[in-house]
Amino acid sequence: MANFPRSAKRNLNENDTNFSLAKEYEELLRKIEKTKTILHTSGNVEVGITPHEVVQETRAYKLTHYRPMLSKTARTPILIVYALINKSYILDLQVDKSWIHSLVSQGFDVYLINWKSPTQYDKYTSFDDYVNVYIDDCIEYIRSKKIIDQVTLHGYCMGATMSAMYCSLHQEKVKNLATIAPVIDSSRDTTVLANFSRHLDAERMFSTVGNMPKEQLYSCYSALKPFKQGVNKYLNLVENIDNDSFVQNFLRIEKWLYDTPDIAGETFRQWISDIYQHNLLYKNEMKIGDHLIDLSKITIPFLNIVAEEDHLVSPECSAALNDCVSSTDKRLLRFHTGHVGLIASSYSQNNVLPKVGQWFRTRS
């Protein structure tokens, strides 16, 4: 580590401003060196901390089960459908900020779909496969295992959109639908991501590269907030490098940000073309396979959770789902946080999850 020159130190009085600056300079260098060392070992950070077991596995997904932590449990199990972007352990990053740990500690029987990264053999995998095959298979497993007729379907982001699609076609198997930040009405989405998606040639990308590469996905999301993602977060890390709790949380988030799978080419094409560019889902004109998605057919109890400061999905884009469904028992919850803060923060634990848990409890 570089040090302030000793010859210069000898000429400084401890009361001098220059002496104070020298000490601050040395302290900054120490923190930078410590930061470099920690970042080089960041891959060892632990995630996915709540006890669980894989109960079903295919080439497309792993179905994970989290047992409730209370002797008295809710009757209806919850199936969480995560997005196809990034990895699902953001929902279980660390105990004090874990969405899943909070649910199981409240007595809920929770299942989670962990999507696998597609290979080039999977580039023709579409929403028809994800919704009518993979999600349906998971629900059938739970119904058979628990000897029940219905589950609570709980989706996040892209997974919330797919959950709504599923309920429009198969709601006889779903008791309640709860969505977090779904992409529904793209005409109301004013984010940079939505604007970028409107100008993307998804057809050409699919025909050229097949699956959407994870490297391009990461670059795209990082570019949405370039100063924050490229500079500011590392300055904050240096400033807080002696705070172990801050550092561990930073490393877990960083691991998740870089851990991005590819997206199946046909699914990505539909996502961009049908939903963002032509707004077919909101218009009830989107087809997956031979099935027309009509969101107005959803009549089951419905909870929609949106983030007012979401920079990935505008809150009004998500809130539109409340107008689409025909449920008489429906509720929209708005929270002053961001896309990730909604599910993986102290704010979420204190403000979001108590209300979500209460909603589940009274309908399970």
Regions found by a protein language model. Give the residues of each.
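Short, surface-exposed "cap/lid" segments of acyl-processing enzymes
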Residues: 41, 48-119
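Short alpha-helix in the alpha/beta-hydrolase fold that links the catalytic acid
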Residues: 288, 300, 314-323
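Catalytic histidine-centered segment of alpha/beta-hydrolase-like enzymes
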Residues: 312-315, 332, 336-351
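Gly/Ala-rich beta-loop-alpha elbow adjacent to hydrolase catalytic centers
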Residues: 154-159, 163
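Short beta-strand/loop motif that positions the catalytic acidic residue
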Residues: 298, 304-306, 310
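N-terminal targeting or regulatory segments adjacent to alpha/beta-hydrolase or S9 domains
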Residues: 1-48
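Alpha/beta-hydrolase active-site loop
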Residues: 124-145
